[in-house]
From Swiss-Prot:
This is Peptide chain release factor 1. GO terms for cellular component: cytoplasm. The gene is prfA. Peptide chain release factor 1 directs the termination of translation in response to the peptide chain termination codons UAG and UAA. Belongs to the prokaryotic/mitochondrial release factor family. Methylated by PrmC. Methylation increases the termination efficiency of RF1. Keywords: Cytoplasm, Methylation, Protein biosynthesis. The keyword Metal-binding does not apply. The modification N5-methylglutamine is found at Q237. The keyword Amino-acid biosynthesis does not apply. It comes from the Bacteria. Pfam families: PCRF, RF-1. It comes from Thioalkalivibrio sulfidiphilus (strain HL-EbGR7). Its main location: cytoplasm. HAMAP family: Rel_fac_1.
Amino acid sequence: MKPSLLHRLEGVSERFQELAGLLSEPEVISDNARFRRLSMEYSQLEPVVEAFRRYEGAQADLTAAREMQKDPDPDLRAMAEDEAATAAERLETLELELQKLLIPKDPHDHSNLFLEIRAGTGGDEAAIFAGDLFRMYSRYAENQGWQVEILSQSEGEHGGYKEVIARLIGAGAYSRLKFESGAHRVQRVPATESQGRIHTSAATVAVMPEPDEVEAPEINPADLRVDTYRASGAGGQHVNKTDSAIRLTHLPTGIVVECQDERSQHKNRARAMSLLAAKLFEAEQARQQAEQSATRKSLVGSGDRSERIRTYNFPQGRITDHRINLTLYKLDAVMAGDLDPVIEPLINEHQAEKLAALADE
């Protein structure tokens, strides 16, 4: 094992012991936010420390077996050779496991997320496609046992959405969908096309983690302009009677969010504030990443909304992810919510990139 990797593992073990002590201190136990944060860090380090202990055990076995190989007794030497080979094999397996465990974790992988889909070029067909994408993600969420809450929607004239914003609530939601941000392109014959010509349309998808209480940016009420208006869309007669929909404008950044799904203005405001916090958090994260200007450009982790990431070709039943040259001929299943065959290769590629970066250190 490389000395740099060994040094890092020793540091993780020391931090793990430190956390064990901190979590038993009364002042930490009484501080819920700090206790929760330290407990999460402890649980993240535990599998690394356990694997490192197994590695150290295998290393000790290998050292002992090599000492035994010096014994004059040929039977003992033969047995020692077998033990040394077994220990060396275990070491190799455990080193790879430890490298994977040391890959920096995305602290937001456990988070809920905000999903924003906007129709791009293509007019009515783009709005219909945006609706298809929202249905695809909603079905995937249902299959995962997540909740889907629509915060805001602007319907297309012939179906679908000009824009739809939703909150997806579920363990690990962000970890599964974080690579969906970008431009999605569709190639198909629109229902309104009488000549049977294939049209190309697009929609943009943005996936933002919902920041927790500790990391959510503080929003100064003086920095907000609050507008109320009457909700549009489904909801019966009630929608025309009260100004329950909320639009928040964050004056320093110009970011605008809306929420109109709840009948209560108070609930709409709370949801809009949560969405605004996520957008401000995302903007700050993007700024920090730009400042760091990483030398290794990630293939799948950039999250640039303008980047064309995927093409859905309906005549051929083909879906292509351009970031990793993935092509699947199971478009119907994917559009019906079977997204894992697309998501898993992206996650694996991202992990391989991080593993390569770790090996280069």
